[in-house]
Amino acid sequence: MCIRDRHIARTLIDRGFNYHVTEPGPGGSDLFTARFGNIYSARQLLQLARRCYGLFQPQDVAWTRPDGRFVDPFRPQIEPDGYASEQAVAQALPPHLAAVRRMFEESHLFIFTVGLTEIWESTVDGAVFPVAPGVVALPPDPSRYRFVNMSVAEVRADLAEFIGLVRQHNPDLKILLTVSPVPLVATYEDRHVLQATTYSKSALRAAVDEICRHHAAVDYFPSYEIITSWHNGGAYFEADLRSVAESGVAHVMRVFERHYLRTVDRPAARQDAALRAEFARASKILCDEEALDTGR
């Protein structure tokens, strides 16, 4: 989740649907359903589900920021001020995972945007992180991590395992997948970032397509195609050719509403201006990947 899912959530709120929040942020902020931060890869999503059901316990608990504060390496920017100690990071984890578990078990529809095939993982236990070690904080031993660029088969397998796991606990759960149209800001591979972006988006789109063909409870929403298709000549990107313009977001949400919210018994649109304003304010949170730009 980084930009697409927030706009979908805001549209659902505006139309009176229940955007299910199991772990509110400070001041009641509902930017994330639970406070997991941005999730970019299928592997990261799968591991979060496995962790909340006690199937995986990574050895990494806390990393250290340059200012001496500590962060949860799996959601490094969820607490802007960081934590005072490693123990504080560990103590915040059980209630968080319980909230994630409730999210999976109490939801009717789960919407997820896959954004990256490039991941950083621990060589000790395979744990995957949203940003590379050192971008936001440093682990005790930086040599125990490696870069991996996932294949179509690996993304497909991770998504399939995730779907099987969460629907085992919530058989009625439906899943809507999208692919992020936002290009990579950088790549660790020895090739141009344009090549890396083309591979990543192609692999994700192919994997998601195969998943949807084999899972009746899963659908695909083409926000990627709407934003990046040649027919609009790049008009849906800002001047940096990376950020999605408001006109593109509006087009995506019109299509989403037309095809997914058109029901005769849907709740009346909520006229809660304060709620919409708070969601818009909270949505300005820095994406983890954009932290790569802050050090340049």
Descriptions of predicted regions:
Residues 1-3:
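Short, small-residue-biased leader/transition segments that mark boundaries at the very start
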Residues 47-90:
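A basic- and aromatic-enriched beta-loop-alpha substructure that forms the phosphate/nucleotide-
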Residues 35, 42-50, 252:
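Short, Φ-rich (hydrophobic/aromatic) sequence segments
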Residues 15-40:
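Active-site-surrounding "flap" and adjacent substrate/cofactor-binding loops of secreted or lumenal enzymes
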Residues 73-296:
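Alpha-helical cap/lid subdomain in secreted, periplasmic
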Residues 8-15:
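Short active-site loop/helix that positions an aromatic residue
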